[in-house]
Amino acid sequence: MNELIKHKLELLPDSPGCYLHKDKEGTIIYVGKAKNLKKRVRSYFRGSHDTKTELLVSEIVDFEYIVTESDTEALLLEINLIQKNMPKYNIKLKDDKSYPFLKITNESFPRLVITRYIKKNDGLYFGPYPDSYTANEVKKLLDRIFPFKKCKNPINKVCFYYHLGQCCAHTICHTDKAYWDRLIDDVKHFLNGKDDKIIEDLRSKMLAASEEMAFERAAEYRDLISGIATMRTKQRVMSKDLQDRDIFGYYVDKGWMCVQVFFVRQGKLIQRDVNLFPYYNDAEEDFLTYMGQFYQDKQHFIPKEVFIPEAIDEELVAAIVPTKIIKPKRGEKKQLVALATKNARVSLQQKFDLLEKDIKKTSGAIDNLGHLLGINKPVRIEAFDNSNIQGTSPVAAMVVFVDGKPSKKDYRKFKIKTVVGPDDYASMREVLFRRYSRVKKEGLQAPNLIIVDGGVGQVNVAKDVIEKQLGLTIPVAGLQKNDKHQTHDLLFGNPLEVVPLPRRSEEFFLLHRIQDEVHRFAVTFHRQVRRKNSFSSTLDHISGLGPKRKQLLLRHFKTITAIASATSEEIQALGIPKTVVEAIQQQITDNKNDRSSP
């Protein structure tokens, strides 16, 4: 805890409000709310916490707070602040939350369409459906049963569906609008689950077709009845009152929360939504934040009722969700909330089980890798790769895997300093010497295994540096790729030989992941350096354009091409004088002409 935070903690009020934690860059990394700001904010810096909270606290170098008049006002403010700042430690709802709906348009002659966007007073909406496939299947069934208008053709034209008997053009079949009203009413009844009359009508038509020996038509009616029955079985009846409602349940364990939402429409469960995330506040408060974000998404249909668990404050929910909020006390409705809560508990336990299984598999892969190489269990693995284009802007990168997982805080980047031209062996020698001479000198943690990206030559260079130059006893292996640039062989031993490694083994997947990660990290760094060098060479020697302004241009425009495409006004908006902007544009033009001249 720094002195600034210590001083600010003394000044916190005993009031409700919101607090904003910031990192060393001044970026807001977490937004929270509190009934008592003094108690809540101080709690982050006192006592012990779980690992994820300790990680959050380790990044806090400053905080701000906003006092509110009430808990409700704090909740609303928190939701808005999260929406505006998108802090990395706050709850993040999944991006693919817009579910499909069936919509009856409010045109003079309505159509049935599928949409993911709800607009007020723009028609009647039914759903949501769990996915596009389900919505399309329901629509296809309706298209076969009801020949209502399916196109936007002018009233004096027919469409393709008319010739299939699935669209009754209103100027040809019926000019009476009352016919269309009855047809749309039938569709509404069907979508609301009142399909007994429709099934009876179809059954009568099937029997009539059979008596007329029109067996193909009778089979079509039979298939339609079967389709309705199938759709019925996919929708579990959860209540007898045919009400539209969302039912919330949540469960917390080991610093994680799972929220389950049951979408019940016309008394039938048609979809559920599951979200798992780490939480840092009280469980009830983070659940409220989740609900606020959930319904702030305009694509979430707000039903007639929302059921919430017993522990949640109804008034606070009512302040953020404009519908009837119910906290069931007994009977069927309470059982529905209990069912949502039970599903949340099961989903969270499944997550933990999968994590435990993954840990066991990864641990097994590390054990097996150590056994195959005849070394101690390689708990810490450091891997290296070079990146350059014909020797220009040469760089290297190191990634670290601890217990089979990437430890990104330990990743390192290297600019090659002593090598001229494309020489991978010399570059690898320089980087390994720089890395492990420092490990030796400063007593840093050494890896259990070093992996270099390359074949026999790279491994021999690495072993020469580690064993002969530095006198260290760290095992070195090489990962060799095939002609498709895919992980192919593991080289190890003295003399070097290919280690037999089953392609479907966990240890092979681990090595493949390590090689992909170090390659990605090296290439990304090389692009950054190359782009920066391109900036420097093009923008060097321009009067009035110093390092700070060049850095500003680099951050904003990313490339010289983007600067060339920008207007003078856009560049001046960064605080760069007009005369300097003109010099920049002239320099870019001159460079372009030089390259194009013979």
Curated annotation (Swiss-Prot):
Its main location: cytoplasm. GO terms for cellular component: cytoplasm; excinuclease repair complex. GO terms for molecular function: DNA binding; excinuclease ABC activity. InterPro entries: GIY-YIG_endonuc, GIY-YIG_endonuc_sf, GIY-YIG_UvrC_Cho, RuvA_2-like, UVR_dom, UVR_dom_sf, UvrABC_protein_C, UvrC. Pfam families: GIY-YIG (PF01541), HHH_5 (PF14520), UVR (PF02151), UvrC_RNaseH (PF22920), UvrC_RNaseH_dom (PF08459). Keywords: Cytoplasm, DNA damage, DNA excision, DNA repair, Excision nuclease, SOS response. It is found in: Cytoplasm. SMART domains: GIYc. One of its GO terms (biological process) is SOS response. CDD domains: GIY-YIG_UvrC_Cho. Residues 14-91 form the GIY-YIG domain. Disulfide bonds: none annotated. Signal peptide: none annotated. It comes from the Bacteria. Residues 196-231 form the UVR domain. The UvrABC repair system catalyzes the recognition and processing of DNA lesions. UvrC both incises the 5' and 3' sides of the lesion. The N-terminal half is responsible for the 3' incision and the C-terminal half is responsible for the 5' incision. Interacts with UvrB in an incision complex. Belongs to the UvrC family. This is UvrABC system protein C. The lineage of its organism: Bacteria, Bacillati, Bacillota, Bacilli, Lactobacillales.
